[in-house]
Structures are given as C-alpha cells and as structure tokens.
Amino acid sequence: MGGLGGGLWGSVAAAVVILAVLGMVGLYGVFYRPALVLMTALVAVAVFVYLSFSSALGDRRFYLLGPPVIGLSAAGVALLWLGRPEGAGVVAAAYFGEPVLGYFVYRRLASIHRLWALVFLASAAAYAYSLPAVLLGLWAVPAAADLVKLAALLYFVRRV
C-alpha cells in the first residue's frame, strides 16, 4: 500500500509507536533498549511514509526535504545506540522538520476537510516543537500533541 492512504496508515502506526517511546523514555531514559529498538523502527516507518506521501503529493519540495530530515533522525538514533547522549538532541532537532513536511500533507488533506487538516498540522507542530521537553522529563506534553495528531490521522484514514 502506498499513496495517500499508505502515508496516513504509516503515520498512524508511527503515532502509536511514538506514544510508547515517549512513555519508555520518560520512565527509563533515552538509552532504554526497547525504546531504541522502537526508535529504529520509527526511522524505517518514516522512510515508508515519505515514499508513500511523495507519490501522492507529487511536490518536489516535499521530495527534497524528506531525506535530510529522515537522515538526521537516523543519525540521532545511531548516536543513541552508541551511548552518545547528544543523539537525543539530534533526534529532537530532526523532528523540527516534521511540521515543514506536514505542511505539504496538510495542503492535500485540506481538500478533504479543512478543520481536521489544520488540527493535523497544528498538532504535528506542537509535538515536534515540544519534543525537547522529553529531555527535561516532560514527556506528557509531546504525548498529548501526538494523541491529537493521531485523532486527526484516524479521521482522514477513514475518508481516504
């Protein structure tokens, strides 16, 4: 499955995994192996979502911006596997690209339902920009934003 539906389903899966990762990191820290395994899986899911949305959106800017964002996230996860704490900052920095990429998805989703598309984009931004709070033990803040994003994604999955 690819295209818009594949990208949405992949994003739903990622949102659920992210909730688990946030809880694990909040309780056990960024070097907790099960969390690292899930972070690694998230990089693979990100590649699938990127390829799916790329084919559905057909926007050159989306196509060009995805690899650096995913690559930075992969580098951060690799650093965490190596026991380097700065990997967490690299992952958080990579997620700042999510709302930028999400804007291109938003434009497509707005043709289905403008308000839910705005909820999707706003919650993606709130999640991405609050992710560094996890490093301070405030994992519930990005988790709440991720839950709202998940609700918006589920709305669209049922309509595509």
Which residue stretches match the model-derived regions?
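Hydrophobic, aromatic-enriched alpha-helical segments typical of multi-pass transmembrane helices
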Residues: 1-160
